[in-house]
Design a protein with these regions (language model features):
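As written
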Residues: 102-108
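His-Asp phosphorelay/catalytic-motif detector in bacterial-type signaling
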Residues: 4, 29-30, 51-55, 80-86
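Acidic, metal-coordinating helix/loop segments flanking the phosphotransfer/catalytic sites
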Residues: 21, 35-55
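Receiver (REC) domain active-site loop signature in two-component systems and cognate sites
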Residues: 62
């Protein structure tokens, strides 16, 4: 986990992308915000880049490669796993099966996306603040 690295958002809904973009702009984080509408594109980026992201926010229901499948591929890839990138689901539904499956893949959080802008902003602020306070194995001096 690189606290100065980009925040990756994997979300196929353009309205949700726009809302999240507005939220992050209003919170004025210094991290670059990178959006992907497809899990496959996000995986290609994560595998090919030397940049270590700060955190990944992922939807679950996406075409081709779901958020759950993407998490599995990241977790199976030793190089990506060793980067200790927090992987969080930020999605519209919390079906029991999804929550259980997610935690069985060692995710670091499962959040239901609020419908209210202010509530989204507060939850993002809480999540980012939490991870900014955490220590990761890669950055212990």
């Amino acid at each position: 986990m690189n606290k100065g690295g980009p925040i990756i958002i994997i979300e196929d809904d353009l309205d949700d992308q726009e809302t999240l973009s507005d939220v992050f702009k209003s919170l004025d984080y210094k991290n670059e915000i990178i959006f992907f509408s497809e899990g496959e594109k996000a995986l290609e980026y994560l595998i090919s880049t030397n940049v270590e992201p700060f955190i990944i926010f992922s939807d679950i229901n996406m075409p081709r490669l779901s958020g759950m499948e993407l998490r599995g591929k990241i977790h199976e890839n030793e190089d990506l796993r060793l980067k200790s990138i927090p992987y969080l689901f930020f999605t519209t539904s919390a079906e029991q099966k999804h929550v259980v499956d997610a935690y069985s893949k060692s995710i670091q959080g499962f959040f239901v996306k609020p419908t209210d802008y202010t509530a989204i902003k507060e939850i993002i602020k809480t999540i980012v603040g939490y991870w900014q306070s955490c220590v990761s194995p890669n950055y212990i001096k």
